Amino acid sequence: MLVGIMSDSHDNLPLVKRAVEFFNAEGCALVIHAGDIISPFSIAVLNKLACPFRAVYGNNDGEKVGLKLKAAALGGSIDNPPIMVEADGITIRVLHDCGDWRAEARSSGADVVVFGHTHQVVVEYDGEDRKILGINPGETGGWLSGVSSVALLDTAS
């Protein structure tokens, strides 16, 4: 199962649209957004996804009721972090601001921790058998770095 991961889109609609097109082209079965969508009009772009989406609020998501209503109307969901998502037998803990993703994984029992907030890409393994994974997809919006980024998680590998 392929899971698309994005974060910190910050209302940059052209780059959110590009991410949606990428996730659809890759055949993602689920998309996770790790916060800072910002406005309800921005979440509407996720309507073009060919799969369900799950999201958490970020520190800049002020209009929470509007975001929640819009996500629900599109068949997705957005909730206060952290949330746990099950994908093909893999447990994924999703939050926005994560001080120590390894501690989050250990305390929650998650296989994967997805987070955002820093706008910096992180893909790191932890544990003796390297079976615990931390993923920060960077920033989909590209406002701080000038680079738009997302991540893919293949649950089979």
Where in this protein do the model-derived segments appear?
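N-terminal active-site segment of His-dependent metallophosphoesterases
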Residues: 1-48, 62-64, 68-69, 73-76, ...
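Binuclear metal-dependent phosphoesterase catalytic core
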Residues: 79-88, 108, 128-157
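Acidic, histidine-bearing metal-coordination/catalytic regions of metal-dependent phosphoesterases
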Residues: 1-2, 53, 152-157
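Helix-adjacent hinge/juxtasegments
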Residues: 50-98
